[in-house]
């Protein structure tokens, strides 16, 4: 399967160097929403190494799975630094500074790839933009589809924040409560479904259904078309996940290595108390909100080490 080939390439080049060595995932805690804490390694060199691997992942972030497989076959991934430079020039918007959303969007995509094994990249902001004026599509920070061995269809709608803790917490709340609705979702999905031909076959099957809804109902208002999309999700039993990444500066958590696990668990309790009563009635279909939280000791060093 192409998925197996893609994940094999990823694991060889990136995954095996990060999983449970530079990045650790804890068990998820589930109440009204699901909360998954992460942390990075304690060694003071960790943020630099993590930033360097994030840079090496840029090509895999900016290109679809099938394109990555083809590039690997042609030997283009032997030097991931060159591949990253190419992707930055050809696929990524020219954004600089701490406000550059690429840092958080790429880290979300990296963690999804690192800790799942059947999620197909449907869109990142990197994939669709107008080269002439460098305008990006407006929508979720990441969009993925997974179809498991039982043919269950899962749609992952991503929002990612990186920066101060207060900013990350408040903006995730604002984005989900303000944007995560079927109208907003339909607008992006219809745009992509009309253009995407590079993702893997199972994801394309669902995309084709979405494109059919768009075409068959093109004379209707966007609100009516969004309702038709909701009906498709119901008919096809599409599971919707709003996956949110909060990656924020929190050096105090890493002060004492032997207390690190407890500090992380206390941190997730605080996040949970903030969000438990939020994100109700986002869409009419059933959905889950997944909150992935990774405190970072030196966020500035991580960004600088990405070199973008």
Q: Which residues make up each language-model segment?
A:
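A structured, charge-rich N-terminal accessory region that forms the first stable segment of a protein
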Residues: 2-85
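A short, highly charged nucleic-acid-interacting micro-segment common to nuclease
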Residues: 85-109, 129-132
């Amino acid at each position: 399967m192409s998925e197996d080939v893609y994940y094999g390439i990823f694991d060889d080049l990136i995954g095996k160097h990060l999983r449970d060595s530079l990045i650790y995932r804890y068990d998820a805690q589930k109440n009204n929403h699901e909360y998954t804490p992460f942390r990075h390694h304690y060694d003071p060199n960790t943020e630099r190494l993590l930033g360097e691997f994030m840079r090496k992942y840029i090509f895999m972030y900016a290109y679809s799975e099938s394109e990555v497989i083809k590039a690997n076959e042609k030997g283009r991934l032997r030097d991931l630094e060159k591949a990253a430079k190419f992707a930055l020039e050809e696929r990524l918007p020219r954004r600089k500074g701490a406000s550059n959303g690429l840092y958080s969007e790429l880290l979300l995509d990296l963690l999804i790839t690192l800790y799942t094994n059947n999620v197909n990249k449907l869109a990142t902001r990197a994939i669709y933009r107008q080269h002439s004026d460098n305008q990006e599509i407006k929508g979720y920070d990441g969009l993925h589809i997974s179809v498991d061995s039982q043919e269950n269809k899962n749609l992952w709608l991503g929002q990612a924040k990186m920066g101060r803790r207060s900013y990350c917490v408040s903006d995730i709340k604002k984005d989900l409560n303000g944007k995560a609705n079927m109208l907003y979702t339909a607008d992006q999905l219809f745009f992509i479904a009309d253009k995407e031909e590079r993702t893997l076959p199972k994801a394309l099957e669902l995309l084709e259904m979405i494109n059919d809804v768009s075409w068959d109902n093109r004379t209707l208002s966007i609100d009516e078309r969004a309702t038709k999309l909701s009906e498709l999700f119901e008919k096809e039993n599409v599971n919707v996940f709003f996956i949110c990444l909060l990656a924020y500066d929190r050096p105090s958590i890493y002060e004492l290595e032997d207390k690190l696990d407890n500090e992380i668990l206390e941190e997730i309790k605080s996040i949970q108390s903030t969000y438990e009563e939020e994100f109700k009635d986002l869409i009419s279909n059933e959905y889950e909100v997944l909150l992935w939280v990774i405190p970072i000791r030196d966020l500035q060093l991580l960004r600088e080490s990405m070199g973008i």
